[in-house]
């Protein structure tokens, strides 16, 4: 079944520059200048995704849109004024370090506002009934950003800013955020840790970023207790680990919460060739997770689903993973075939690893008080 999928993109988002880096290391001292892309959070992963959509013909089947930048009113619902002022001043001065692993260049402030604006508009389009679902190709990403501190290539909390705008404009009460970026969604967690109107679920590589963080015991506080679920997965985990996490934790949690809107923080850095992680997913892993969460949205949220782009640092492979997600959202299949899918499938963990990971997931599900998921059927 084909669906009305809106795709939010603006070329200016690709113009954010982090300055001279080799992967994530500032050039200087013992760090040599890079021969190619430079900083890991390069525009090329997003540019090549958009190019693959265009060349495959899929763009023509989507509602291609841009959006205005996030307003001060939008941003101030999440970020204090002094943070906006500090960010703008550093950007206007030519850039520098805004926080841990958060370098910016000239114009980054305005581009980050636009990135958040794309996410806001994506939620607006779905909640207004203009699209069945939406994908926001936001850059810079947002899920590590704290209210008053940039972190991990993130400068505004794009998804939180969009959710708070949606609450103000559309009166939506219950929103679920599923973060499958390989790095923990610590910014989203911090913003909603004491609230029960947003369910935050993070699937991430155990101990990857923030360095050493697992988070399984961090389930929220006060009214938010039980509404923050962290699912740390063992390094080296692959397709089976994520399918088990979806079936055993994510889907039952959505069933219990019954959101009116689901937002996915979609990083593609759990893919098997990403330079900043050690997981083993291929494009069909992201396709399968999208199908699961889409069916959950149709069951609980009237189909209202928005996917917001986060990380993913393999220029060669991110486009195939992103294409798979957008094909699944839209119900339109292109002629593109993933050239690494079968190779990655052969590298999947052995049975002993899979059994150990499954046991850990069972223990987490019991800790979270979750019953096994029933098979989801799309709403008719």
Curated annotation (Swiss-Prot):
It comes from Pseudomonas aeruginosa (strain ATCC 15692 / DSM 22644 / CIP 104116 / JCM 14847 / LMG 12228 / 1C / PRS 101 / PAO1). Could be a suitable photopharmacological target for photopharmacological antimicrobial chemotherapy using photoswitchable inhibitors. Probable protein deacetylase that catalyzes deacetylation of acetylated lysine residues. In vitro, exhibits high activity against artificial HDAC (histone deacetylase) substrates containing acetylated and trifluoroacetylated lysine residues. Is not able to deacetylate acetylated polyamines. Binds 1 zinc ion per subunit. This is Histone deacetylase-like amidohydrolase. InterPro entries: HDAC_PDAC, His_deacetylse, His_deacetylse_dom, His_deacetylse_dom_sf, Ureohydrolase_dom_sf. The active site is at residue 144. PANTHER family: HISTONE DEACETYLASE HDAC1, HISTONE DEACETYLASE HDAC1-RELATED. Its EC number is 3.5.1.-. Homotetramer; dimer of head-to-head dimers. Its cofactor is Zn(2+). Belongs to the histone deacetylase family. One of its GO terms (molecular function) is metal ion binding. It is an enzyme of class 3 (hydrolase). Changing residue 144 to A: Loss of enzymatic activity against both acetylated and trifluoroacetylated lysine substrates.
